[in-house]
């Protein structure tokens, strides 16, 4: 096989380990990639910060494009198809990471605001890899779960199979937590650009919480800011923002939890994404797969990710919050983003990108182990199915 030139986003982990068998790997910041950079490459590996289309690719010799992301709204797939360039992405690679984030965020909100998650109904808008897993985990934490996914509901109706999905109006009328897990689509039968607008927010029930970990433009930031200032949305959690990498500082200050687009940034999910692109390139080129991502994410020792059971005298919410934060505490990422509020737009954009590029090596909750004998019986399902931690 001819040696290939591989251009990769600098923030894709283990890319040299995985793709080195195919040729030379060059890494650079995804936001800085230009046509002249791509012109020297046979393989292009990107993340969501690199728009992939004719403006970047026209006249280049690419043989393969991969995006280490779940979403593909930054990729002109019709253009790639017309050019005969194979494309792969990584659906589901960071689904557990995003679910970890939502679980941790909800436990934190419940702890700060009083009350238990078991007393709340959650509406999950978008039930693909992330939303589907999250539905199971939040159910295990005692929440009533409503699922909304029009494309999947239509497909199930066409097949004559049951699905259990409900209309968005039902979610907005009955749920006091709404969490968004949809792709960004500007047109078509189910557009999601500014899905959460003033009308959506007006239909939310009193005391509702809103979480967005999908794409920033799914939420109209101005509408959410106005609603928060009126007190119409009781709590808001945003990991994604319009105008990234320079989000509106007023909106950062207005929400309860603000993080720099890192919900899916657990190291396990990142490496899983690299592995999925690697396997896709092997298939495209007929090469033998010699690298496995599982070797890269194995803990250094059996005790490396061992947690400790919290004080059994704590309330259920406090107990589960204290255990979850041993694996991941989103308040740490919230503090780092709030430090950017006083910066100007350009400096804020650079700092936002730096937070993502230099993100710590967080591990998924399912990689963590807790002594089984120290877990009270009433928490066992919450630990193993809600937090996805292992008992030993």
Swiss-Prot record:
Task: Cite the active-site annotation.
Answer: 215, 244, 261
Keyword NAD included in the entry's annotation? yes
**Which SUPFAM superfamilies does this entry report, sorted A to Z?**
Formate/glycerate dehydrogenase catalytic domain-like, NAD(P)-binding Rossmann-fold domains
- Secretion signal, residue range per the UniProt entry: none
Its main localization is: cytoplasm
Among the GO molecular function terms of this UniProt record, one is: 4-phosphoerythronate dehydrogenase activity
| Annotated source species | Salinibacter ruber (strain DSM 13855 / M31)
The EC number(s) given in the record are 1.1.1.290
Alphabetical GO biological process terms: 'de novo' pyridoxal 5'-phosphate biosynthetic process; pyridoxine biosynthetic process
Instruction: Enumerate the Pfam families for this protein.
Output: 2-Hacid_dh, 2-Hacid_dh_C
Pull one GO CC term from this UniProt entry. cytosol
Q: Name the protein family.
A: Belongs to the D-isomer specific 2-hydroxyacid dehydrogenase family. PdxB subfamily.
Supply the name of the protein. Answer: Erythronate-4-phosphate dehydrogenase
Q: Which residues form a coiled coil?
A: none
Binding positions for NAD(+) per the UniProt entry: 149, 239, 264
**Main EC class the enzyme belongs to:** oxidoreductase
* Classification of source organism: Bacteria, Pseudomonadati, Rhodothermota, Rhodothermia, Rhodothermales
Oligomeric state and partners? Homodimer.
Role description: Catalyzes the oxidation of erythronate-4-phosphate to 3-hydroxy-2-oxo-4-phosphonooxybutanoate.
Q: Name the gene that codes for it.
A: pdxB
Residues binding substrate are 48, 69, 265
Pathways involved = Cofactor biosynthesis; pyridoxine 5'-phosphate biosynthesis; pyridoxine 5'-phosphate from D-erythrose 4-phosphate: step 2/5
Name where it's found.
Cytoplasm
Write out the entry's keywords from A to Z: Cytoplasm, NAD, Oxidoreductase, Pyridoxine biosynthesis
Which reactions does this protein catalyse? 4-phospho-D-erythronate + NAD(+) = (R)-3-hydroxy-2-oxo-4-phosphooxybutanoate + NADH + H(+)
């Amino acid at each position: 096989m001819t040696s290939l030139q591989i251009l990769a986003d600098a923030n894709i982990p283990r890319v040299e380990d995985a793709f080195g068998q195919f040729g030379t790997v060059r890494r650079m910041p995804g936001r800085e990639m230009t046509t002249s950079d791509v012109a020297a490459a046979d393989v292009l590996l990107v993340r969501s910060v690199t728009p992939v289309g004719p403006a970047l690719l026209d006249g280049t010799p690419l043989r393969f494009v991969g995006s280490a992301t779940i979403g593909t709204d930054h990729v002109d797939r019709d253009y790639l198809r017309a050019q005969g360039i194979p494309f792969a992405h990584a659906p589901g690679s960071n689904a557990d990471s995003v679910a970890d984030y939502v679980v941790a965020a909800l436990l934190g909100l419940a702890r700060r605001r009083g009350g238990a998650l078991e007393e709340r109904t959650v509406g999950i808008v978008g039930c693909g890899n992330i939303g589907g897993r999250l539905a199971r985990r939040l159910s295990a934490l005692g929440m009533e779960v409503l699922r909304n996914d029009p494309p999947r509901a239509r497909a199930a109706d066409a097949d004559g199979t049951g699905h259990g999905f409900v209309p968005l109006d039902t979610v907005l009328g009955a749920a006091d937590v709404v969490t968004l897990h949809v792709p960004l689509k500007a047109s078509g039968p189910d557009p999601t650009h500014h899905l959460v607008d003033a009308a959506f927010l007006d239909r939310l029930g009193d005391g509702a919480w809103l979480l967005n970990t999908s794409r920033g433009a799914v939420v109209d930031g101005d509408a959410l800011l106005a609603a928060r200032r009126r007190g119409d949305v009781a709590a808001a959690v945003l990991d994604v923002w319009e105008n990234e990498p320079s989000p509106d500082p007023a909106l950062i200050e207005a929400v309860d939890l603000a993080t720099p687009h890192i919900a899916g940034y657990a190291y396990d999910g990142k490496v899983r994404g690299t592995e999925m692109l690697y396997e896709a390139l092997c298939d495209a080129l007929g090469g033998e797969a010699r690298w496995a991502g599982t070797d890269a994410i194995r803990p250094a020792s059996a005790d490396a990710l061992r947690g400790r059971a919290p004080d059994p005298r704590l309330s259920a919410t406090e107990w589960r919050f204290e255990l979850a934060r041993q694996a991941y505490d989103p308040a740490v990422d919230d503090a780092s983003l709030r430090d950017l509020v006083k910066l100007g737009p350009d400096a804020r954009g650079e700092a936002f990108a730096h937070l993502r590029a230099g993100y710590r090596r967080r591990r998924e909750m399912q990689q963590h182990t807790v002594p089984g004998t120290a877990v009270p019986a009433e928490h066992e399902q919450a630990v193993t199915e809600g937090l996805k931690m292992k008992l030993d």
